[in-house]
């Protein structure tokens, strides 16, 4: 059952810092109207179904890379792709990963926002530069890449993490990596197990858009009028269509 959120909403008159997660920034990018309804008025989109298999892959990859983190050696995949780095060992690693409770945070003074995000992994190269890593899982025939329009959200996700770590005083490489697990669909039988091909995809991030976007978010939230919907927003299209039918038939 959907409920209106009464807490953690933006109040233009409040002087308390307001938390904005990486996922909410992405929601703003998808549709300013949905974002405003969510963060200002407490009306969220219906929740999507959890991708439990993807979560399982994330957990197992983290465990696997943690073995090499403890040994301070590169993972075999890093060697295969010629990546001169090792998984970063840091006392805050688990905190940075925990997007629900804390994650990595930064207070953005111009907006009075606290920006938060939970990273999958961080590697470090011999120069001490951090490399942001994100785990992804899919099951498709053909080459896995990050070239589809809908995968722009993956790229923005990477760039926000890079920005957050820089704002926390770390030297961060513009190069990040997606560790992509692709479920095999060409096996003769399931046999109670799902096998994956795992590859690493390099991505050159550019976080120049973030400061401007945060200012736009602040301006939108501070206004008393609901912004226009993104014309491609399926949630708003459904809402508007349902409303027009109800008014017509009512």
Feature roles, as predicted:
Residues 55-56, 152, 201, 227:
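Residue-level detector of secondary-structure boundary/capping sites
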Residues 1, 10-14, 19-20, 164-250:
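Metal-dependent nuclease catalytic regions and adjoining charged, substrate-binding loops involved
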Residues 98-212:
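Mg2+/Mn2+-dependent nuclease catalytic core
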Residues 1-129:
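Metal-dependent nuclease catalytic cores that hydrolyze phosphodiester bonds in DNA/RNA
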Residues 36-37, 44-46, 140-143, 184-188, ...:
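Short catalytic/ligand-binding loop motif for oxyanion handling, primarily in non-cytosolic enzymes
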Residues 47-49, 143-149, 224:
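Short, polar/flexible loop-turn hinges at active-site or ligand-entry regions and domain interfaces
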């Amino acid at each position: 059952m959907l409920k209106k959120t009464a807490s953690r909403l933006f109040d233009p008159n409040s002087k308390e810092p307001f938390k904005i997660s990486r996922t909410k920034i992405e929601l703003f990018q998808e549709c300013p109207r949905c974002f405003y309804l969510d963060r200002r008025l407490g009306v969220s989109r219906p929740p999507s179904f959890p991708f439990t298999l993807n979560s399982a892959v994330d957990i197992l990859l983290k465990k696997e890379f943690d073995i090499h983190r403890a040994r301070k050696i590169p993972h075999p995949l890093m060697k295969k792709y010629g990546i001169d780095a090792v998984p970063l060992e840091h006392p805050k690693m688990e905190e940075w990963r925990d997007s629900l409770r804390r994650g990595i945070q930064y207070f953005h003074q111009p907006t009075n926002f606290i920006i938060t995000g939970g990273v999958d992994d961080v590697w470090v190269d011999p120069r001490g530069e951090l490399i942001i890593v994100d785990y992804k899982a899919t099951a498709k025939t053909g080459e896995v890449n990050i070239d589809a329009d809908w995968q722009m959200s993956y790229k923005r996700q990477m760039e926000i993490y890079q920005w957050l770590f820089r704002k926390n005083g770390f030297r961060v490489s513009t190069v990040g990596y997606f560790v992509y697990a692709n479920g095999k669909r060409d096996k003769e039988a399931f046999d109670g197990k799902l096998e994956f091909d795992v590859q690493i995809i390099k991505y050159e991030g550019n976080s120049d858009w973030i400061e401007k976007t945060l200012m736009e978010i602040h301006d939108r939230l501070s206004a008393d009028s609901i912004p226009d919907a993104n014309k491609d927003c399926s949630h708003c299209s459904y809402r508007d269509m349902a409303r027009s039918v109800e008014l017509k038939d009512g």
